Amino acid sequence: MGNFVFDKRVAQVFPDMINRSVPAYSTIVDMIGLLASQYAIPGSNCYDLGCSLGATSLAIQNGTTGRNCRVIAVDNSEAMLDQFKSQVSEHENIEFQLADIREVEFVDCSFVALNFTLQFLPLEDRPVLLKKIHDAILPGGCLVLSEKVCFKDPLEGQFHDSLHAQFKRANGYSDLEIAQKRSALENVLLREPRESHQSHLGQAGFSRSYTWFQCFNFVSLIAFRD
């Protein structure tokens, strides 16, 4: 089985796949909309980096209703963006960018979401992108960073990985399917400990970061530029 690719085939099954694979994914998406309602600055831009089929983009849009914010949805998969576009009416205040998130030029942004996206970048590229995002965010704005993490304590890692595998079995995946997906993602999704992510955020210039969600080995952080 080859490496995992976000192609047309994956785009067609993505909502089902991610909800069966990521615990509380829909809750995370909904809460990102809530966070946007709290922290997006009126009249600014909100970026969803690695937007896939746009669930997070739409949650941000809903959370910023009446604030004159524009949501900029970025993905490097044309298949993903095309399917997202087909589900959105023209009047909705969403701009689509087919681009590598490392190449995005951020403008007037106060809210950025990296919802299970950073983990697909090479390790050496992550601090550079976080620094670029920090420097572009308006004071008072924030970054939401969701990641599948690993753990410094091997026993803790085994605990969470085992529970995650059981979660997928409960959602209809066979042990063979779980093993095949793990193999496909092995060289594509590169996990880091939560502490490393928080260290990267601090080094990028974010004044503070908090864990607002965790289920098994899935974590979401919010980092502020004060």
Model-derived regions, located:
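Core SAM-dependent methyltransferase catalytic element
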Residues: 204-226
